[in-house]
């Protein structure tokens, strides 16, 4: 499978900024004549669980000939959620599908079941993160450890907390 954003070839597992991926990509594959295919694009790292960005079914010979079950939406990872994987998966269909999907945050197993698809015949992925930071917030290394700042003083058998003003 080959993926092109803005007419540029994209290498598998490459990092792309969300701004580079807002337009619908062109997907190419060596399709067998008169067979039906389904293309899924999803983000398994979404804050709300698996999120679908694009679903195309009933593809014959070219993705452009397929039916958009779920229209394309470009990646938009929220700030401080780290790196997200965006995965394209191509499946061979058993029969013609007349399914409409409106929800984007749904499980992969549910989608596979309603589309009657099994295992992908081709996969592609890229990674992305929010352009305004993108790193998860670092946790304090001293969390739970006793340091000079949070050490308590013992009076008898009971600790009393040293207050900072």
Spans of features found by a protein language model:
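N-terminus-centered regions that define maturation/targeting leaders and the start
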Residues: 1-141, 147
């Amino acid at each position: 499978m080959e993926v092109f954003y803005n007419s540029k070839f994209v290498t598998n597992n490459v990092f792309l900024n969300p701004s580079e991926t807002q337009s619908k990509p062109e997907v190419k594959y060596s399709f067998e004549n008169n067979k039906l295919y389904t293309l899924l694009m999803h983000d398994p790292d979404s804050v709300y669980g698996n999120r679908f960005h694009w679903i195309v079914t009933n593809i014959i010979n070219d993705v452009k000939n397929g039916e958009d079950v779920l229209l394309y939406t470009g990646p938009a990872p929220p700030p401080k959620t780290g790196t997200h994987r965006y995965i394209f998966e191509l499946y061979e269909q058993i029969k013609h599908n007349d399914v409409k999907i409106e929800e984007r945050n749904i499980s992969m197993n549910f989608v596979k079941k309603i589309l009657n698809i099994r295992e992908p015949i081709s996969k592609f992925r890229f990674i992305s993160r929010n352009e305004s930071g993108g790193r998860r917030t670092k946790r304090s290394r001293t969390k739970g450890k006793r340091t000079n700042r949070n050490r308590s003083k013992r009076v008898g058998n009971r600790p009393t907390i040293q207050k900072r003003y």
